[in-house]
């Protein structure tokens, strides 16, 4: 198996699901590959998913038949081939085309191979001049129907103006975002902020490593070196600064019992353990696989317990700090969660909001009098953030101690250190009158609700 053939197969499966793309594990498929080939497969698959809508639109402009009538395996090959031609400058065109054609002939027939050859060579002809990031057309790509923007701030000039005429649809296609998400953003934050968010979604999310002393740095080495670096000290972790900031809101508290209700793979659990070393911490997650990872990660940590969902009986009414990092639309972390770029719609948002409310209602009986709740999402949507917190305050007679809505930062071509995810977090209590501002080790310029860029924050 070659790295390309593995990606072809994986994208074929995804093409049946689109826009409901799955988060697939690499599993056994890439184990036989060496590090270089694994890195290539990873870059090709993630790059294709991140620009799926853009690539599909360009491919459709070269077709005489409906995209939906093409065999899923061939759709996967075409997407991967177009991604190499347009997104991976180091890959020669002939390498991208030849393996796509040969794999298709083996998988299907010579006719299908000829079809793939013709379409990918049309993509090569469609790709024109490459613009420097300082070129005005590259900087204002959304104004032009013939500009294909790239993650480094550069852009391709296409030989035909194939992007849609309508500006909002064009923005979604060029930035590879769903129409419903673009329209929702325009309706809530306006056109200018939507443009900035869309441009941010073209950038590559860096890997941020939190060192044992709490400092945060962008990792620039290989994945193998990163794995070794993390194994050397289990206090190191991968975490974006915005994600780390939410737990830092609890820094001035002295909780005896903490529950991390939706712990995922334990990123915030690790941070809670570091910030509150004397607390008893109970962590859970409804997903069996993630819960197994939690058991492995905290196997030798005495004051962290991994429990089954809803098995918190012995701490009912005794929890001092409840952490609710709830499932959400992921709209603040789309460069990291490319699968979420296309599935946003009003009905899904309503479903997520309902799920979040269910989680809140199920978990709040754990709290003792005067306890605190940390509510966090990686979403930009007010329905999942500010409106949920408003509902919590009314429904449970709670008060907001601090809240923060954070816009994502970092544009294509910017230094990786400027990048931050977007998100929201709020610390609430039913007994906030007992709290004073100086009880919290927070930034002095932080307001109760802000949209500031946490560029200089440390996790």
Residue ranges and their predicted role:
Residues 278-282:
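Short beta-strand element of Class I
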Residues 254-262:
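Conserved class I S-adenosyl-L-methionine
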Residues 276, 367-369:
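Helix-to-beta-strand junctions that scaffold the AdoMet/dcAdoMet cofactor pocket
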Residues 276, 325-361, 379-383:
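Mobile active-site "lid"/loop adjacent to the S-adenosyl-L-methionine
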Residues 309-323, 327-329, 350, 369-459:
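C-terminal catalytic and target-recognition region of SAM-dependent MTase-like enzymes
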Residues 1-231:
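Class I Rossmann-like S-adenosyl-L-methionine
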């Amino acid at each position: 198996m070659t790295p390309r053939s593995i990606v072809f197969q994986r994208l074929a499966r995804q093409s049946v699901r689109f826009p409901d793309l799955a988060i697939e594990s690499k599993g056994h498929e890439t184990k036989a590959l060496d590090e270089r080939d694994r890195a290539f497969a990873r870059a090709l698959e993630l790059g294709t998913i991140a620009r799926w809508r853009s690539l599909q639109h360009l491919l459709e402009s070269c077709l005489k038949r409906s995209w939906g009538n093409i065999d899923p395996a061939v759709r996967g090959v075409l997407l991967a081939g177009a991604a190499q031609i347009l997104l991976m400058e180091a890959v020669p065109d002939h390498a991208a085309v030849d393996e796509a054609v040969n794999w298709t002939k083996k998988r299907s027939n010579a006719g299908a191979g000829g079809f793939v050859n013709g379409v990918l060579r049309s993509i090569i002809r469609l790709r024109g001049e490459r613009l420097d990031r300082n070129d005005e057309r590259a900087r204002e790509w959304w104004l032009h129907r013939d500009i294909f923007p790239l993650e480094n701030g550069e852009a391709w000039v296409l030989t035909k103006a194939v992007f849609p005429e309508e500006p909002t649809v064009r923005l979604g296609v060029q930035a590879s975002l769903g129409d419903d998400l673009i329209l929702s953003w325009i309706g809530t934050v306006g056109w200018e902020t939507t443009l900035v968010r869309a441009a941010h979604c073209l950038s590559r999310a860096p890997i941020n490593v939190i060192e044992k002393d709490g400092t945060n740095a962008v990792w620039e080495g290989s994945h193998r070196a990163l794995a070794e670096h993390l194994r050397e000290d289990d206090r190191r972790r991968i975490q974006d600064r915005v994600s780390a900031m939410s737990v830092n809101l609890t820094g001035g508290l002295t909780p005896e019992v903490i529950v991390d209700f939706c712990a995922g793979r334990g990123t915030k659990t690790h941070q809670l353990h570091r910030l509150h070393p004397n607390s008893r911490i109970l962590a859970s997650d409804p997903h069996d696989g993630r819960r197994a990872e939690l058991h492995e990660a905290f196997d030798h940590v005495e004051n962290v317990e991994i429990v089954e969902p809803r098995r918190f009986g012995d701490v009912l009414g005794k929890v001092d700090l409840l952490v609710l990092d709830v499932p959400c639309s992921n709209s603040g972390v789309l460069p990291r969660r490319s699968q979420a770029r296309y599935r946003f719609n009003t009905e899904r948002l309503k479903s997520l909001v309902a799920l979040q409310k269910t989680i809140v209602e199920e978990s709040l009986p754990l709290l003792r009098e005067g306890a605190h709740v940390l509510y966090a999402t990686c979403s930009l949507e007010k329905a999942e953030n500010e409106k949920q917190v408003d509902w919590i305050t009314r429904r449970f007679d709670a008060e907001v101690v601090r809240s923060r809505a954070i816009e994502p930062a970092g544009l294509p071509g910017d230094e990786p250190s400027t990048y931050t995810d977007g998100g929201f977090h709020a610390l609430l209590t039913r007994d906030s009158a007992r709290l004073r501002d100086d009880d919290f080790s927070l930034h002095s310029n932080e307001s109760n609700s802000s949209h500031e860029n946490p560029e200089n924050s440390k996790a």
